[in-house]
Amino acid sequence: MIRSMISRLLPLLFAAAVFAEAPRPRPGFEGVGVRFTSASASGSGKAEDSATGFEVTGNFPLLKSGSWQYDWGFRYAQTRHDWTAAPVSFDLIRGASLNLSGYASTEAGRSRYAVLQVNGDAAEGVSLGDALTVQALYGADWRRSDTFTLGYLFLAETRAVRSPMVLVVPTFRWQFAPDWSLGTGRKSLVLERKLDEAWRASLTLAYQQEEARLADFAGQRQDYESERVAALFGLRRTADGRTDELTLGWAFRAQARREVGGVESEYDLAPGLLISLGSRWRF
């Protein structure tokens, strides 16, 4: 019965993975992390974007009220781009976020979480204050059995290039074998295997997105958005309050949008190799 349920819900489950950008708080969520990324283009004749960057994140306890634990958090990121045969030519994107999040768990196997996040992503020379977007997220999970958790996610957000979005979709995690699980992640669908008490391996179908306010073009506002669909292999080690993760993957579908003065244009990006290395320290 569970298998037939998942097959019917797969389109919506993928939508949950695609659009759930804000962090989903949970017990033990507090900590700081750093991640380095690299993306190289394949040289297939399409517009090419080779990029390197880093991201620093943190989540810190704020207060406890009843069954809810509230945190505040931040993100700061920089990505440097090297373009070939593309209609855009910016070099550096800076991004920052502030969020207020909360989570609550009950003895009945239900957990709830909520996030309000303000983002700003802009090219060098453009104020982050001119590139603000807002995202609100609320969700709940129910542990239906020892191996299956089902929930939903409500998301409302403003976006740099396209119109605001409101979405309600299901989420899940299914442990279909003692060391195997399948579930929705952050903009991803994740198949994970437990190797031992410290190590996990995963295969992920991921959606990656970048939005930014660019410098005005001929006196008109200019915005940029890119999207990638990628297959990723990851190794993660968690021990002594620290998590280290290495990810290798291939972006097999990539597209970008550029909006100037309200007029939008699209172009394809070349596929390419993705590498990510990160660590997170829990409090």
Enumerate the language-model features and the residues they cover:
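Residue-level signature of outer-membrane beta-barrel architecture
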Residues: 58-62, 102-106, 140-142, 174, ...
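Outer-membrane beta-barrel "beta-signal"
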Residues: 168-174, 179, 231-240, 268-283
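Outer-membrane beta-barrel translocator domains and adjoining extracellular loop/strand segments
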Residues: 40-49, 81-89, 124-132, 161-169, ...
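Transmembrane beta-strands of outer-membrane beta-barrel pores
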Residues: 36-42, 74-82, 118-124, 154-160, ...
